[in-house]
Amino acid sequence: MKNFFDLFSLPTDFSIDLDTLEKKYFEFQKKFHPDKYGDKSDEIEQSIAINEAYEVLSNPLKRAAHILRLNGLDVENDVVAPKVDQATLLEVFEMRESGDLSAKDLSQKIKSLLEEVSKNLGNKNFASAAQILIRAKYFEKTLQDLKVKKWH
Protein backbone atom coordinates (compact mmCIF):
# COMPACT_ATOMS: atom_id res chain seq x y z
CA MET A 1 0.00 0.00 0.00
CA LYS A 2 1.25 3.45 -0.88
CA ASN A 3 1.81 5.93 1.90
CA PHE A 4 0.39 9.15 0.46
CA PHE A 5 2.15 11.20 3.13
CA ASP A 6 5.51 9.98 1.80
CA LEU A 7 4.55 11.00 -1.73
CA PHE A 8 4.16 14.59 -0.53
CA SER A 9 7.09 14.40 1.94
CA LEU A 10 4.71 15.04 4.85
CA PRO A 11 4.77 13.40 8.27
CA THR A 12 2.25 10.57 8.65
CA ASP A 13 0.07 12.59 10.98
CA PHE A 14 -3.59 13.57 11.02
CA SER A 15 -2.76 17.25 11.53
CA ILE A 16 -1.03 18.36 8.35
CA ASP A 17 -0.44 21.79 6.90
CA LEU A 18 -3.04 21.98 4.14
CA ASP A 19 -1.33 24.98 2.53
CA THR A 20 1.90 22.98 2.18
CA LEU A 21 -0.06 20.04 0.79
CA GLU A 22 -1.75 22.24 -1.80
CA LYS A 23 1.51 23.95 -2.77
CA LYS A 24 3.25 20.58 -3.30
CA TYR A 25 0.24 19.28 -5.21
CA PHE A 26 0.38 22.15 -7.71
CA GLU A 27 4.16 21.72 -8.07
CA PHE A 28 3.64 18.02 -8.85
CA GLN A 29 0.82 18.84 -11.25
CA LYS A 30 3.14 21.10 -13.23
CA LYS A 31 5.89 18.49 -13.25
CA PHE A 32 3.79 15.39 -14.02
CA HIS A 33 0.85 16.76 -15.99
CA PRO A 34 -0.16 14.16 -18.62
CA ASP A 35 -0.21 16.77 -21.41
CA LYS A 36 3.55 17.20 -21.00
CA TYR A 37 4.34 13.54 -21.55
CA GLY A 38 1.84 12.26 -24.09
CA ASP A 39 1.69 8.49 -23.87
CA LYS A 40 4.44 7.94 -21.29
CA SER A 41 2.65 5.59 -18.92
CA ASP A 42 5.01 6.10 -15.95
CA GLU A 43 4.30 9.82 -15.86
CA ILE A 44 0.57 9.25 -16.33
CA GLU A 45 0.57 6.74 -13.46
CA GLN A 46 2.49 9.24 -11.32
CA SER A 47 -0.07 11.94 -12.13
CA ILE A 48 -2.92 9.59 -11.17
CA ALA A 49 -1.17 8.69 -7.89
CA ILE A 50 -0.64 12.38 -7.10
CA ASN A 51 -4.33 13.17 -7.70
CA GLU A 52 -5.45 10.23 -5.58
CA ALA A 53 -3.05 11.13 -2.77
CA TYR A 54 -4.17 14.76 -2.80
CA GLU A 55 -7.84 13.77 -2.70
CA VAL A 56 -7.22 11.53 0.32
CA LEU A 57 -4.92 13.86 2.26
CA SER A 58 -7.03 16.99 1.71
CA ASN A 59 -10.14 15.32 3.18
CA PRO A 60 -9.92 14.74 6.96
CA LEU A 61 -12.18 11.67 6.92
CA LYS A 62 -10.21 10.04 4.10
CA ARG A 63 -6.90 11.11 5.68
CA ALA A 64 -7.80 9.43 8.97
CA ALA A 65 -8.93 6.29 7.12
CA HIS A 66 -5.61 6.25 5.25
CA ILE A 67 -3.62 6.47 8.50
CA LEU A 68 -5.67 3.64 9.95
CA ARG A 69 -5.16 1.54 6.81
CA LEU A 70 -1.40 2.14 7.07
CA ASN A 71 -1.69 0.73 10.59
CA GLY A 72 -3.66 -2.35 9.61
CA LEU A 73 -7.26 -1.16 10.11
CA ASP A 74 -9.35 -0.79 6.97
CA VAL A 75 -12.46 1.25 7.82
CA GLU A 76 -13.40 1.45 4.13
CA ASN A 77 -13.88 -2.31 3.77
CA ASP A 78 -17.43 -3.16 4.86
CA VAL A 79 -16.46 -6.75 5.63
CA VAL A 80 -13.80 -5.96 8.25
CA ALA A 81 -14.62 -2.37 9.27
CA PRO A 82 -16.22 -1.68 12.63
CA LYS A 83 -19.94 -1.08 12.35
CA VAL A 84 -21.78 2.05 13.44
CA ASP A 85 -22.72 1.61 17.07
CA GLN A 86 -26.33 1.62 18.27
CA ALA A 87 -25.88 4.87 20.21
CA THR A 88 -24.92 6.73 17.02
CA LEU A 89 -27.84 5.27 15.09
CA LEU A 90 -30.21 6.24 17.88
CA GLU A 91 -28.74 9.75 18.16
CA VAL A 92 -29.23 10.45 14.44
CA PHE A 93 -32.69 8.86 14.47
CA GLU A 94 -33.74 11.08 17.39
CA MET A 95 -32.33 14.17 15.66
CA ARG A 96 -34.32 13.35 12.53
CA GLU A 97 -37.51 12.61 14.46
CA SER A 98 -37.32 15.78 16.53
CA GLY A 99 -36.62 17.95 13.51
CA ASP A 100 -33.35 19.12 15.09
CA LEU A 101 -31.27 17.88 12.19
CA SER A 102 -29.35 20.89 10.89
CA ALA A 103 -26.28 21.11 8.68
CA LYS A 104 -24.62 23.36 11.25
CA ASP A 105 -25.16 20.89 14.10
CA LEU A 106 -23.99 17.95 12.00
CA SER A 107 -20.88 19.83 10.87
CA GLN A 108 -20.07 20.69 14.48
CA LYS A 109 -20.58 17.06 15.51
CA ILE A 110 -18.25 15.87 12.73
CA LYS A 111 -15.63 18.44 13.72
CA SER A 112 -15.80 17.31 17.35
CA LEU A 113 -15.51 13.64 16.37
CA LEU A 114 -12.52 14.39 14.11
CA GLU A 115 -10.79 16.08 17.05
CA GLU A 116 -11.27 12.84 19.00
CA VAL A 117 -9.97 10.83 16.05
CA SER A 118 -6.90 13.07 15.89
CA LYS A 119 -6.22 12.58 19.61
CA ASN A 120 -6.57 8.82 19.36
CA LEU A 121 -4.35 8.63 16.27
CA GLY A 122 -1.74 10.73 18.06
CA ASN A 123 -1.84 8.32 20.99
CA LYS A 124 -1.65 5.35 18.58
CA ASN A 125 -5.01 4.13 19.89
CA PHE A 126 -6.04 2.97 16.43
CA ALA A 127 -9.02 0.81 17.43
CA SER A 128 -10.70 3.74 19.20
CA ALA A 129 -9.81 6.09 16.35
CA ALA A 130 -11.42 3.66 13.90
CA GLN A 131 -14.64 3.44 15.91
CA ILE A 132 -14.88 7.22 16.25
CA LEU A 133 -14.10 7.67 12.54
CA ILE A 134 -16.95 5.30 11.66
CA ARG A 135 -19.26 7.56 13.70
CA ALA A 136 -17.90 10.67 11.96
CA LYS A 137 -18.43 9.06 8.56
CA TYR A 138 -22.01 8.20 9.48
CA PHE A 139 -22.70 11.81 10.50
CA GLU A 140 -21.01 13.00 7.28
CA LYS A 141 -23.27 10.71 5.24
CA THR A 142 -26.28 12.08 7.13
CA LEU A 143 -25.08 15.63 6.40
CA GLN A 144 -24.73 14.86 2.68
CA ASP A 145 -28.21 13.29 2.65
CA LEU A 146 -29.60 16.41 4.33
CA LYS A 147 -27.96 18.67 1.75
CA VAL A 148 -29.32 16.58 -1.14
CA LYS A 149 -32.79 16.60 0.42
CA LYS A 150 -32.74 20.41 0.69
CA TRP A 151 -31.92 20.73 -3.03
CA HIS A 152 -34.83 18.51 -4.09
PLM regions with names:
Residues 1-152:
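C-terminal accessory/regulatory regions appended to core domains
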